[in-house]
Amino acid sequence: MALYAMGDLHLSFSTPEKSQERFGKIWKDHEWKAKKNIEKLVRPDDTLVLTGDHSWANNLVQCQRDLEFIEALPGRKILLRGNHDHFWKANQTEKLNEMFKGKLRFLQNNFYTYRDYALVGSKGFCFEGPFFIDTRTNLITGYDKAAYEQSVKLVDREMKRLITGIDAAKAAGYTKYIIFLH
């Protein structure tokens, strides 16, 4: 019963115009290469946490083939929401868990277990601002207060989601945690 994590599959079976190949030839057939490597490593009784950016799809209908691809991977699959997972609305986690019960598990505002650990996670948020940096000199040349305030809101929201999962795990008696961030 091993625990594995990987992220950023960026599948596009129903959205070929968003194929990763647009970023270069190295991405050709990346999904099949990932599948082959996962199948070499992950066994049916292992847990595979997919840490976000599963699909380029904009909605659940478009995402169906991508999720079927993930379902077919070995192991117990736990999916964390990434910044490109537009098919997964923040208030849909429970609905997704019902729809894919026994096949996929969606991790947001909740927890799953691995041995005596609670698995919790959030997509987190990373931002480059609010400072403007001159790349030639590495000196700060400006500041965007609105960008800073928006970033603080996003970081706070994701932190609350993470804490909700930790609190649920604590209430269930867990004292050890593995935290995943996209």
Where are the regions a protein language model picked out?
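Short beta-strand segments
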Residues: 51, 180-182
